[in-house]
């Protein structure tokens, strides 16, 4: 059984094992034991109500209960940029013209911005390559939306996801090589790692403050602006189908797309609903469709991916499923179809 749940301190070894396989470019998931321990502690403290809004962040794991193994992670930051600046580039068009020469040029430029300050963030999505099959990745990503829907008041009006940009296995980023390298003088992998472990002051100290004309970058760098790493293409598609869109904001290091949406307009949030559960000795799932089913408990939030009839007002679960969700007869659960309805 694949169970989506809040992270625990005891998950540290499993989470670290995953981080070793994540590779370069997943900034918020560094292979650093102390940082991962702190990240887990921050999530636990957030669930326990010990942190101010600016520090709050939820980390979840996807557990293979049959193997007692952490198969994936995903996270939500409540409000970014309230204590430390959160930077991104915005792609903007500027007009240059000469009446004397009869020349009119529309030129794109990159402007350093802090537009996402105060917004919530979807981040740290990584699934063990051994589990990258079936619907595990989609479940791991979208289960967060049911948590957001259940505890909507915690989060901001807008949410975004900064997608991993284009880089090769050695950590070479065309965008970084053409832009960031000139200002920082360090490899992309080092800048990415420093940001991941919380060393961010160098960004404000060294990043260019004036607009940068995109036409001055290399052809390779221009091609990857607003694009994502080949391994991130499925994750981008998942979010876009839920209503998040690219609006010209990109990652300052690798040029990866930043997707965003108003939370209340996200399909899985607005279509999710509450139903009552009943225990059944056995359940036939043949007439169902893949749905995410989650309990309504804050600190013990749990979700399963089950084939069920989504439009029914009653949901029958086996004893094992009820145990995994920690619900009893008559309790309410929140559910939503895994995929949008086809028009």
Swiss-Prot record:
Pfam families: AstA. One of its GO terms (biological process) is arginine catabolic process to succinate. The keyword Aminoacyl-tRNA synthetase does not apply. Transmembrane segments: none annotated. Pathway: Amino-acid degradation; L-arginine degradation via AST pathway; L-glutamate and succinate from L-arginine: step 1/5. It catalyses: succinyl-CoA + L-arginine = N(2)-succinyl-L-arginine + CoA + H(+). Succinyl-CoA binds at residue 125. InterPro entries: Acyl_CoA_acyltransferase, Arg_succinylTrfase_AstA/AruG, Arginine_N-succinylTrfase. GO terms for molecular function: arginine N-succinyltransferase activity. Its EC number is 2.3.1.109. Keywords: Acyltransferase, Arginine metabolism, Transferase. The active site is at residue 229. Catalyzes the transfer of succinyl-CoA to arginine to produce N(2)-succinylarginine. Belongs to the arginine N-succinyltransferase family. This is Arginine N-succinyltransferase. It comes from Photorhabdus laumondii subsp. laumondii (strain DSM 15139 / CIP 105565 / TT01).
């Amino acid at each position: 059984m694949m169970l989506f749940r809040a992270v625990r301190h005891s998950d540290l070894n499993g989470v670290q094992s995953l981080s070793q396989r994540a590779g370069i470019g997943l900034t918020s998931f560094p292979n650093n034991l102390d940082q991962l321990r702190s990240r887990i502690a921050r999530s636990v403290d957030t669930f326990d109500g010990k942190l101010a809004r600016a520090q709050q962040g939820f980390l979840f794991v996807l557990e293979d209960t049959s193997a007692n193994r952490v198969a994936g992670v995903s996270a939500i930051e409540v409000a970014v940029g309230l204590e430390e600046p959160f930077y991104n580039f915005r792609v903007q068009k500027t007009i240059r013209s000469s009446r004397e020469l009869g020349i009119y040029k529309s030129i794109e430029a990159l402007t350093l911005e802090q537009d996402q300050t105060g917004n919530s963030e979807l981040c740290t999505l990584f699934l063990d390559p051994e589990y990258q099959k079936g619907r595990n990745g989609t479940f791991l990503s979208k289960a967060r939306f049911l948590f957001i829907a259940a505890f909507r008041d915690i989060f901001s009006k807008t949410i975004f996801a900064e997608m991993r940009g284009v880089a090769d296995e050695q950590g070479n980023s065309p965008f970084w090589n053409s832009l960031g390298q000139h200002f920082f003088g360090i490899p992309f992998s080092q800048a990415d790692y420093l940001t991941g472990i919380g060393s961010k002051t160098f960004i404000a100290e060294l990043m260019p403050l004036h607009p940068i004309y995109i036409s001055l970058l290399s052809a390779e760098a221009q091609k990857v602006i607003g694009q994502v790493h080949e391994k991130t293409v499925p994750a981008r598609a998942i979010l876009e189908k839920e209503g998040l869109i690219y609006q010209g904001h990109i990652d300052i290091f690798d040029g990866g797309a930043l997707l965003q949406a108003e939370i209340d307009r996200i399909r899985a949030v607005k279509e999710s609903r509450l139903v009552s559960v009943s225990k059944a000795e056995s359940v036939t799932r043949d007439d169902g469709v893949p749905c995410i089913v989650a309990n309504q408990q804050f600190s013990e939030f749990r979700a399963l991916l089950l084939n069920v009839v989504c439009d029914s007002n009653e949901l029958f679960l086996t004893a094992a499923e009820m145990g995994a969700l920690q619900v009893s007869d008559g309790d309410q659960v929140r559910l939503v179809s895994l995929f949008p309805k086809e028009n």
